[in-house]
């Protein structure tokens, strides 16, 4: 509880005077006070030194006090690296992967050759062509379509446009009938001559 009050006192909060009196008398609270200030200065990057001057001496003492366990060395012959290379398994493994390695190297060389030629050709073609846009921003019909409820629609026909359209269709039908009659008359004449 005293450490919480000590932390609050460091943050600038009001604490009881009993805590201040205890801080002046108790060495453990003074050590906590010191460690809290050290932590605060390190967190605020106010101090680069956060280890005490006697840190190395403490570590040396702790290392000396540590129990040393002795392990009996069991003499087991370990294979030498030369033996591992000469084992039957390694020889079979090398024999299995050697052709695959050769094929992989050949495929890599071919890939580099093809990509190199293509990139070389693309650079030459790109220099001869006019600049084309990377991103086509207009629709295929090259017209911007308005998107609004009140926008006039280009698809609805007026009465004048409908009348012109029906006249055009009528003229096309008359032309078709005339050509059909002329063609049928020409067929009748040629068929009568053949008889």
From Swiss-Prot:
| Protein name, UniProt field | Anti-sigma-E factor RseA
Domain-related comment? The N-terminal cytosolic domain interacts with sigma-E. After degradation by RseP binds to SspB, targeting RseA for degradation by the ClpX-ClpP protease.
List residues in topological domain: Cytoplasmic: 1-94
* Subunit details: Interacts 1:1 with ECF RNA polymerase sigma-E (RpoE); this inhibits the interaction of sigma-E with the RNA polymerase catalytic core and leads to a decreased expression of sigma-E-regulated genes. Interacts with RseB with 1:1 stoichiometry. The liberated N-terminus forms a complex with SspB and RpoE.
Gene3D superfamilies listed in its UniProt record? 1.20.5.3960, Anti sigma-E protein RseA, N-terminal domain (1.10.10.880)
Q: Note the topology in the membrane.
A: Single-pass type II membrane protein
Listed GO cellular component terms? Answer: plasma membrane
Q: Which residues cross the membrane?
A: 95-117
Q: Mostly located where?
A: membrane
Keywords of this entry: Cell inner membrane, Cell membrane, Coiled coil, Membrane, Signal-anchor, Transcription, Transcription regulation, Transmembrane, Transmembrane helix
Q: Which organism is it from?
A: Haemophilus influenzae (strain ATCC 51907 / DSM 11121 / KW20 / Rd)
Q: Which GO terms describe its molecular function?
A: sigma factor antagonist activity
Tell me, what does this protein do in biology? An anti-sigma factor for extracytoplasmic function (ECF) sigma factor sigma-E (RpoE). ECF sigma factors are held in an inactive form by an anti-sigma factor until released by regulated intramembrane proteolysis (RIP). RIP occurs when an extracytoplasmic signal triggers a concerted proteolytic cascade to transmit information and elicit cellular responses.
Task: Extract the InterPro entries matched here.
Answer: Anti-sigma-E_RseA-like, Anti-sigma_E_RseA_C, Anti-sigma_E_RseA_N, Anti-sigma_E_RseA_N_sf, RseA
* Keyword Cytoplasm set for record: no
Instruction: List the residues marked with site Cleavage.
Output: 148-149
Where is it located?
A: Cell inner membrane
Q: Which residues lie on this side of the membrane: Periplasmic?
A: 118-195
Q: Which residues form a coiled coil?
A: 160-181
Instruction: Consult the record and explain the modifications the protein receives after translation.
Output: Sequentially cleaved by DegS (a site-1 protease) in its periplasmic domain between Val-147 and Ser-148, then by RseP (a site-2 protease). The N-terminal fragment is then degraded by primarily ClpX-ClpP in an ATP-dependent fashion. Sequential cleavage by DegS, RseP and ClpX-ClpP frees RpoE from RseA.
Family per UniProt?
A: Belongs to the RseA family.
